[in-house]
């Protein structure tokens, strides 16, 4: 799996950063791309990358603020002409996302050549697709804002070839049955497949947050995550300024990393008050502290393997 950032600014774009958009490549589990938020200009950002809109099967919106959704109508329209013809799309988001899209399409007389399934979240959501489980939980941002916990499928353990040979089963097509089924039959006897496989491995967990001030659901979403994507609109100064506007301060994120046992954190949604030089200087200062957890300030077009 791989996460790519097409927009990392907060509120407004800058000369260096677009508004919010994240792509999650599900390979090798699925040949699909999921988008999280579609800020203004997202489709233009995607043109500079190998990702194709036709491979986007799901879009998850964290909340209805403009820097997270103003690029959605244009991207949906372009998908009709960029490999998305007749390919269904699932759009998940807060209440109102369906009305927003349909009104935009109707008023602009735009017509899509593929179906959209809308899933509007109330308080929380559990969604299953292609072996993935996605949980959405409400955050604290003044308007409904959600964080998504994406859990990849479990990977089946490696076939124990010697154990299978011991029962007279030589390598061949039957091995695929052992790998993919709970039981298999050989020479008239039924065997439990798990007795001939190594331990299964849980797939990675990715936590992707919408805008929020600290709240209890953050720990539910990020618990033991392999990768967490979190906003830090304020990366210096007083914490109360961030919380007054229902946003997170860098110190809030660091506390969450430690409480939730997060392995790696990618910090986005940086205020446009910070330029690249500011961000680099603040990063160097922060990592001098031995208590600083593992994190990166991300920039547009950064990609990270999961």
From Swiss-Prot:
Describe cofactor binding as the record notes it: Binds 2 Zn(2+) ions.
Signal peptide as annotated in the record: none
- Could you say which EC number(s) this protein's record lists? 3.1.26.11
Q: Which residues catalyse the reaction?
A: 67
Keywords per UniProt = Endonuclease, Hydrolase, Metal-binding, Nuclease, tRNA processing, Zinc
Which Pfam family is one of this chain's hits?
Lactamase_B_4
Entry-linked SUPFAM superfamilies: Metallo-hydrolase/oxidoreductase
> Binding residues for Zn(2+) 2, per the UniProt record?
67-68, 211, 269
Q: Which GO terms describe its molecular function?
A: 3'-tRNA processing endoribonuclease activity; zinc ion binding
Residues that coordinate or bind Zn(2+) 1: 63, 65, 141, 211
Q: Give the first-level EC class, as a single word.
A: hydrolase
What is the required cofactor set for this protein? Zn(2+)
Classification via InterPro entries: RibonucZ/Hydroxyglut_hydro, RNase_Z/BN, tRNase_Z_dom
| Catalysed reaction, written as an equation | Endonucleolytic cleavage of RNA, removing extra 3' nucleotides from tRNA precursor, generating 3' termini of tRNAs. A 3'-hydroxy group is left at the tRNA terminus and a 5'-phosphoryl group is left at the trailer molecule
UniProt key word Ribosomal protein: no
Assembly and oligomerization: Homodimer.
Q: Which HAMAP family match?
A: RNase_Z_BN (MF_01818)
Protein family according to the UniProt entry: Belongs to the RNase Z family.
Stated role:
Zinc phosphodiesterase, which displays some tRNA 3'-processing endonuclease activity. Probably involved in tRNA maturation, by removing a 3'-trailer from precursor tRNA.
Q: What is this protein called?
A: Ribonuclease Z
* Lineage summary: Bacteria, Bacillati, Bacillota, Bacilli, Bacillales
């Amino acid at each position: 799996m791989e996460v790519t950032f097409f927009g990392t600014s907060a509120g407004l774009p800058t000369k260096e950063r677009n508004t919010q958009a994240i792509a999650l490549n599900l390979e090798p589990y699925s040949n699909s791309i999921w988008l999280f938020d579609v800020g203004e200009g997202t489709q233009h950002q995607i043109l500079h990358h190998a990702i194709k809109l036709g491979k986007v099967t799901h879009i998850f919106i964290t909340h209805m603020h403009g820097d997270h959704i103003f690029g959605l109508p244009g991207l949906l329209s372009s998908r009709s002409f960029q490999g998305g013809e007749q390919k269904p799309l699932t759009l998940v988001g807060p209440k109102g996302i369906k009305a927003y899209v349909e009104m935009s399409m109707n008023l602009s007389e735009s017509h899509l050549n593929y179906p959209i399934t809308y899933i509007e979240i109330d308080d929380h959501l559990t969604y299953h697709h292609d072996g993935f489980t996605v949980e959405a939980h409400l955050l604290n941002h003044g308007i409904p804002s959600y964080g998504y916990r994406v859990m990849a499928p479990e990977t089946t353990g490696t076939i124990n070839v010697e154990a299978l040979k011991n029962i007279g089963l030589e390598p061949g097509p039957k091995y695929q049955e052992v790998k993919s089924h709970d039981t298999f039959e050989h020479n008239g006897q039924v065997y439990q497949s798990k007795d001939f496989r190594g331990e299964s491995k849980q797939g990675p967990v990715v936590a992707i947050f919408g805008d929020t001030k600290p709240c209890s659901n953050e720990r539910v979403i990020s618990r033991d995550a392999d990768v967490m994507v979190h906003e830090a609109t304020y990366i210096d100064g007083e914490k109360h300024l961030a919380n007054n506007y229902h946003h997170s301060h860098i110190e809030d994120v660091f506390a969450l990393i430690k409480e939730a046992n997060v392995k790696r954190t990618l910090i986005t949604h940086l205020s446009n008050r910070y330029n690249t030089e500011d961000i680099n200087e603040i990063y160097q200062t922060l990592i001098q502290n031995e208590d600083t957890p593992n994190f990166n300030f991300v920039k547009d077009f950064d990609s990270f393997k999961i």
